[in-house]
Amino acid sequence: MKKRTREQTGLIPRSILRTFERFRKQLLPGAEMLVIQEFRISRYQVIVSVRCLITLIFVPLFINILSKSFLIRPGIEYLWNQNHNEIFLNSYQENRALHDLHQFEEKVYFDSFVTDFAPSSNVLLQKQSVEIAKNYNLESIEAISNLFADFLSFLSLSVVFLLLKPQIIILKAFLSESLYSLSDTTKSFLLILGTDLLVGFHSPRGWEVFLEWLLRHFGLPENSDFMSLFVATFPVFLDTVFKYWIFRSLNKISPSTVATYHNIIE
């Protein structure tokens, strides 16, 4: 039977070992040339990483904005208004429109008592109904346009990942090195900040707002039962993943960070 190779975890953190190794190299003959070479490599790594990060962010963003503004939205708007008699994408959108109209009707009814002269309520309701219909018609067009534009952005991001594989490897190495170079207290602070934002005590409300925005962004029905189930289960799943990652990976990479993290939360 073949023995399984396991990664040995020493008592000394790897960051200290890397620092000691660099210090040892600086004492060797030709250390000046070595320092210059390391500086050039570091500068090249920073330049490539910044370019790669900018490309990953702005290329899909520009494709989304340009395709949506000049191609997708005009086409969707023409097809929707010419070949579609409906205004709403789903019943939840229609209920929101009726709720808005009902609120306006109550406001007109209240104003008719507090003002001496009030225009005809039927005329106001008719104008408001037309305005609400226009707004929700535009919301439906916007939701369908978002679906196609975001799909194109995802495709463009996938193509960028395929074309920039070497640069992405350098970017990952640069980000890892930058993260490992932080102090244990700073890394623990960022870890606590991330976990509290995603799975903390006040995170359910944030997940509700995010899920509501996401459903409206794509014109999907806002099912309260689904939202409650998602908010009740997804943060728990994320919390389990975080704890497993801390125990399985971070404890090997930087045990001092894990120790500092536990001291802070205690």
Swiss-Prot record:
Indicate the transmembrane segments per the record: 46-66, 151-171, 226-246
**Catalytic activity annotation:** K(+)(in) + H(+)(out) = K(+)(out) + H(+)(in)
Which keywords are on file for this protein?
A: Antiport, Chloroplast, Hydrogen ion transport, Ion transport, Membrane, Plastid, Plastid inner membrane, Potassium, Potassium transport, Transmembrane, Transmembrane helix, Transport
* Disulfide pattern: none
**Record's subcellular location:** Plastid, Chloroplast inner membrane
Swiss-Prot/TrEMBL GO biological process terms: potassium ion transport
Q: Does the keyword Transmembrane helix apply?
A: yes
* Lipid bilayer topology: Multi-pass membrane protein
Q: Which domain of life is it from?
A: Eukaryota
- Classification via InterPro entries: CemA
Molecular function terms, GO-annotated: antiporter activity; proton transmembrane transporter activity
GO (cellular component) term, any one: chloroplast inner membrane
> What does the protein in this record do?
Contributes to K(+)/H(+) antiport activity by supporting proton efflux to control proton extrusion and homeostasis in chloroplasts in a light-dependent manner to modulate photosynthesis. Prevents excessive induction of non-photochemical quenching (NPQ) under continuous-light conditions. Indirectly promotes efficient inorganic carbon uptake into chloroplasts.
Family classification: Belongs to the CemA family.
Q: What is this protein called?
A: Potassium/proton antiporter CemA
What organism does the UniProt record list as the source? Answer: Chlorella vulgaris (Green alga)
